[in-house]
A protein has these predicted regions:
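Active-site-adjacent betaalpha module
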Residues: 2-10, 43-44, 56-185
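N-terminal nucleotide-binding beta1-loop-alpha1 segment
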Residues: 10-16
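Active-site loop/turn elements of alpha/beta-hydrolase fold enzymes
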Residues: 16, 53, 124
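Short connector loops/turns at beta-strand edges and beta->alpha or beta->beta junctions
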Residues: 16-19, 115
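A positional/architectural concept
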Residues: 19-24, 28-50, 55-66, 71
Length: 185
């Protein structure tokens, strides 16, 4: 088991698109939290990949994607079957967020594990239309070797120390994410 190392990690945001988000349980909550995480990661100069599955049919990502992020339109369910592998390839660790847990997220995680990556699935930043699908997907991904984490685990592991220059902004993000969760519960 490993702790997230920001120098060896990339973050993958899967298919948070206009026609999909409203159909998924807690889709708007997940998208809102992902939007804030992505903005913070952009300030951290993190390796970020955003995928859109059949964008012509499902629409674009529901929030602004920073120019520094790699944006990939895909048709395969697995996000690494297409161009996003270019950014992910040099990174040993991949943090995964997105939709749907049992479809594109699941197949991506399985392919990442097969490629010998350390995979961290952010349980409060993945979603499916039916909660049973999310639950089953998380169980299978964990059994296959993925580490199931929360957004707070990701952030505190990313920073690791109160003396880190990004600690203050990370703590503000944690507080904001807690407010968002409380408002939507």
């Amino acid at each position: 088991m490993a702790v997230i190392d920001r120098h060896r990690a990339s973050v993958l945001f899967i298919d948070m698109q206009e026609r999909l988000v409203p159909e998924v349980e807690s889709g708007n909550l997940v998208a809102s939290m992902c939007e804030r995480l992505m903005a913070w990661l952009s300030d951290q100069q993190a390796a970020v990949v955003v995928t859109e599955h059949c964008a012509a049919k499902l629409g674009n990502t529901v929030f602004e994607v920073p120019k520094t992020a790699m944006r990939v339109d895909k048709t395969a369910f697995s996000a690494i079957k297409e161009h996003s592998v270019q950014v992910i390839a040099p990174q040993q660790q991949v943090i995964v967020c997105g939709m749907e847990s049992h479809l594109c997220v699941f197949q991506t995680v399985m392919d990442l594990l097969e490629a010998q990556k350390q995979v961290f699935v952010v349980t409060d930043l993945v979603a499916s239309r039916d909660p049973i699908d999310k639950m089953a997907a998380l169980a299978r991904m964990q059994a296959a070797g993925a580490m199931i984490v929360t957004i707070e685990m990701v952030l505190f592991e990313w920073v690791r120390n109160t003396s880190d220059a990004s600690f203050g902004s990370m703590l503000q993000l944690v507080k904001r994410l807690r407010q968002i969760k409380a408002t939507n519960s």
